[in-house]
């Protein structure tokens, strides 16, 4: 039963099987949390968003189109909820997250940590729609087609938005003296 695909689990959920929903939650709780955390940089806020996402998934499961990929649908909800949460946060709260790096050498670890922190802070200074494409591509390692499905954009628009987002991020990093 654990190897069931998303579509089968969704069908079982729609038939009222709560255990199937539990399996979906187990399957997606880390990816949803990670996506929210990459957008918000705060574990408590990311947990709140993840909780809201699964509540919305449960409440709106009947609206899910089984012809689409389930993970695209849940990531879309996650991004929307993360953007909503960003609107409720003050900028200082949004960049307070702390992520450690597992580099082998201490000096390299410190450098990587400083660069990660600078990138996190720079990401928080660009618009959420631009931040979202960077998170999807570089942190969640999604392809352009999947990104387009999640963002409900054509693939060319995704590529264009990613190019613009990278330029904006680079500009902020240059302005901060990082690059």
Where are these predicted regions, by residue range?
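Arg/Lys-rich amphipathic alpha helix in sigma70-family domain 2
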Residues: 62-66, 76-96, 112, 164
């Amino acid at each position: 039963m654990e190897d069931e695909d998303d579509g089968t689990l969704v069908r079982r959920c729609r038939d009222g099987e709560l255990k199937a929903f539990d399996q979906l939650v187990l399957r997606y709780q880390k990816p949803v949390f990670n996506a929210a955390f990459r957008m918000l940089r705060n574990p408590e806020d990311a947990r709140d968003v993840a909780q809201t996402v699964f509540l919305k998934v449960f409440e709106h499961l009947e609206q899910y189109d089984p012809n689409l990929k389930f993970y695209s649908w849940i990531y879309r909800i996650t991004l929307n909820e993360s953007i909503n949460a960003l609107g409720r946060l003050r900028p200082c709260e949004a960049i307070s997250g702390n992520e450690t790096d597992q580099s082998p050498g201490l000096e390299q670890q410190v450098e990587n940590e400083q660069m990660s922190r600078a990138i996190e802070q720079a990401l928080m200074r660009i618009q959420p729609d631009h931040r979202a494409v960077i998170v999807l591509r570089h942190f969640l390692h999604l392809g352009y087609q999947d990104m387009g499905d999640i963002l409900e954009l054509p693939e060319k628009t995704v590529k264009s938005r990613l190019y613009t987002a990278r330029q904006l991020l680079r500009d902020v990093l240059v302005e901060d003296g990082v690059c």
